[in-house]
Every structure is written in structure tokens, then in C-alpha cells.
Amino acid sequence: MGLIDFLRNKTKTAETAKNRLQIIIAQERTQRGGPDYLPLLQRELLEVIKKYVKIDANAVKVDLIKDGANDVLDISVALPDDSER
């Protein structure tokens, strides 16, 4: 029976690890201060802009700014000179 009890404890260990990981993820989200969709939004905006203008990956910046009770989505796109388009 000791072997069966040993194997059952692994499920508790896995559950404990899962709970710890969820806590770590929640803490990282709180520290970042932004929702999870911002990196995806930035990549999708970059792909749409690349259809029309040649820009590098660092040309699009998306930030969420908290202004009192309001949240402001700040999108900055650095466009190249006319000669580089």
C-alpha cells in the first residue's frame, strides 16, 4: 500500500505546483499592470501596418495608461521617411 500512497501524493504535488504557477502568473500580471492582450494587439497592428508601409518590429508601441478612473490605450507608430516607404 505504500507504493499506492506514494503515487497518490503525486497528484497532490501536481495540484500544488499548478496552484503555485497560477499565483506566479497572477503576480506577474499585477506587476506588469496591463492586460494580457496588449502584446497580441501590438503584433496584429504591426502586421496590418506592414501591408502598407515598410517598418521594423520596434516601430509600433502599445501601452495602457491609467489616468484616474480612466484607462487610455496609447498606440505609437514610428513611420519611416517618404524615401524609405
UniProtKB/Swiss-Prot annotation:
GO terms for biological process: cell division; regulation of division septum assembly. Keywords: Cell cycle, Cell division. The keyword Cell cycle applies. InterPro entries: MinE (IPR005527), MinE_sf (IPR036707). Belongs to the MinE family. Prevents the cell division inhibition by proteins MinC and MinD at internal division sites while permitting inhibition at polar sites. This ensures cell division at the proper site by restricting the formation of a division septum at the midpoint of the long axis of the cell. This is Cell division topological specificity factor. It comes from Xylella fastidiosa (strain M12).
